[in-house]
């Protein structure tokens, strides 16, 4: 299980951002070059442009008459990320949280700002689960999203702006935040449902003892790891999400509060799904062990039957193998054939008897 394919050759394991410092660095595994794009929209206009990371000021691009959405893709340029955070009134420690993928999920509310740090989970085309660190900074009419890679995570949110879904171009930045969170939560819902579906497929396979179950143990372990990733990313988010419903800084207005309630319901669905996955995994482990015991019992049963058939044959062979001088059977003309016939008759009789008793 890995975060993405874009893995830095040194994996930045020497960077932890665990201590107080004047400057922090990106501590993740992606090697995506930092790019910044700015989408500005209002009732009448919508346009997007690229911004250089070495700009002396990012605040100068803000249009007070529009919603300004900065998309920062790639966190390798930690200096640019820190400057953006500082310029919009946040502390260096907030930059540390953004640059540290190992940071816990949190929603931090200030007087005029809000910082959301979380992780998104999704399956790629190879059906491998990926986890990506995402942060969202919102202040007034400015929304800044930070992603580790250049994957189009928020493509659906941009399309919603283009089509003016739910009158987003007439609303404040709180509705844009709702669309961004909806994209992340939708990925978690899809991932959790996919894991549950795959676990149910494994269960159907295990219930049919005739199926080949050679790699089922490894498959269960793999699905368990995927479940743990989703649970790790969703459980803390659900606990923190209540802060958004109680916020009083004006970012989330009363007219869009039902949307956030719906997002909370989706998170609750994810929690319920992961709980279901946990129970299924527990039962699958028991079922897998039980099936292994049944297969071992079946093997021992076959070996016992074979041994039982050969016990009387061994007895007969032992008698005729004794070296007594007075054994008339040894001098019979048809003694050898009679011995073979008796052995076959004994073996067949034993087999028929066990078959009649339904022992196999």
For the regions a protein language model found, what residue spans apply to each?
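Peripheral, non-transmembrane regulatory/ligand-interaction domains of membrane transport proteins
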Residues: 1-246, 251-253, 262, 266-273, ...
